[in-house]
Design a protein with these regions (language model features):
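An N-terminal, globular interaction/scaffold subdomain
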Residues: 1-174
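ATP/pyrophosphate-binding catalytic subdomain of soluble kinases
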Residues: 224-291, 297
């Protein structure tokens, strides 16, 4: 590998890339919003980005101009979370390119500062095609800037493209900094299965957020259950079983609980989603609040702990669960799984 980097960084030349694999073609740094904007402009005006090194010969590349279908903003509490999300997003560059801004805050009570790394990854779909390239901006901000991340995000957005906020950790629903980010977004991506406690309070706050803002929400906890939903639905594709649907009056869901804290500290977001899906498909609604009910450990309980039935009293109604959206949530989830598999293989080696 040969890198052509000045003081602020710049294009990187590699030996020919593998078709379909993302390759780092640009890397630079900036210490202000204005500096980030200048580096983003430099990426697409640099003639060196269109060249590749093949032995001693420099050949022209067919590099597409900036290709983006959305703005993706990732709020990463820790550096390793941001890096994992970036690896996932880079896998999608060829199919779902985006301008990605990965934000981390540090030392909110100290002086205001900003440090940014600007990268461009390109994917060659086939030998005779133009490469698809997308930008990734890693921003760490401290002091006043770290408390107002929306002020950093706003000038870096590509206008007229949808904005998606991906919050891998537990979003602080109700806090003003988070609300400021939500207000500029079209979609929020979360993973409710990792929230503290039962997760019910966070679900309530998230539902209140959606009532207040025209914000679509995708939760990996719901997406991961798609095979369960398909399996249950396929049972009632059998004509002899279909009549039983009309006689369902009560649903009990049994799930694994934490060994160290029991049902009171076990996240039940996925069981709640499953109950909600069943209720929506059957035209039911919740008659009284959902709550975990303690039960003794049984020999047939899941291996991770005891069994706690989530009893839901449901009756006929008009509830409906709407899924879908403009962004490839399923594709992101698949890329996440692929990243985890690569990490496991690396550890084994």
């Amino acid at each position: 590998m040969e890198a052509n980097l000045g003081m602020a960084g710049g294009p990187i030349t590699f030996t020919p890339a593998t078709i379909g694999e993302p390759v780092l073609r640009w890397r630079s740094r900036a210490r202000s919003i204005e500096g980030i904007e200048q580096e983003l402009s430099r990426i697409w005006t640099s003639p060196d980005l269109n060249r590749d090194l093949d032995g001693d010969k420099i050949t022209d590349l067919r590099v597409a101009a900036r290709t983006s279908v959305m703005n993706l903003v990732v709020i990463a509490r820790r550096q390793e979370i941001g890096e994992r999300c970036a690896s996932t997003i880079q896998r999608l560059t060829g199919r779902h390119p985006s301008r990605t801004t990965i934000l981390s805050s540090a030392d909110p009570d100290g002086p205001s500062w900003l440090d940014a790394q600007i990268q461009a990854h390109c994917v060659l779909p086939r030998q005779d095609a133009a490469a698809t390239c997308a930008e990734t901006i890693y921003v760490t901000a401290g002091g006043e800037g770290g408390r107002h991340l929306d002020a950093i995000v706003a000038p870096l957005l590509i206008h007229d493209l949808p904005v998606t906020v991906w919050w891998p950790d537990e979003p602080p629903f109700g806090s003003q900094p988070a609300n400021d980010l939500f207000e500029m977004a079209d979609r929020l991506i979360v993973d409710g299965s990792g929230w503290r406690g039962t997760g019910l309070e966070q679900l309530r706050r998230m539902a209140a957020l959606q009532e207040r803002l025209p914000l679509a929400i995708s939760d990996f906890a719901l997406v991961r259950q798609s095979r369960w939903r398909e399996t249950i639905a396929s049972i009632f594709d059998i004509p002899n079983f279909l009549p039983y649907l009309r006689h369902l009056r009560r649903i009990a869901i049994t799930y694994a609980v934490r060994e160290d804290g029991g049902a009171e500290t076990t996240n039940i977001v996925k069981p709640v989603y499953h109950a909600a899906w069943l209720a929506s498909r059957l035209g039911m609604r919740v008659e009284k609040p959902l709550a975990p009910l303690a039960s003794p450990v049984r020999p047939s309980a899941p291996r991770h702990g005891g069994a706690a039935p989530l009893a839901t009293a449901l009756r006929r109604g008009g509830a409906q669960l709407v899924a879908g959206g403009r962004i490839p949530v399923q594709a992101i989830l698949a890329a996440l799984d692929a990243t985890e598999e690569d990490e496991r293989e690396t550890r084994v080696e």
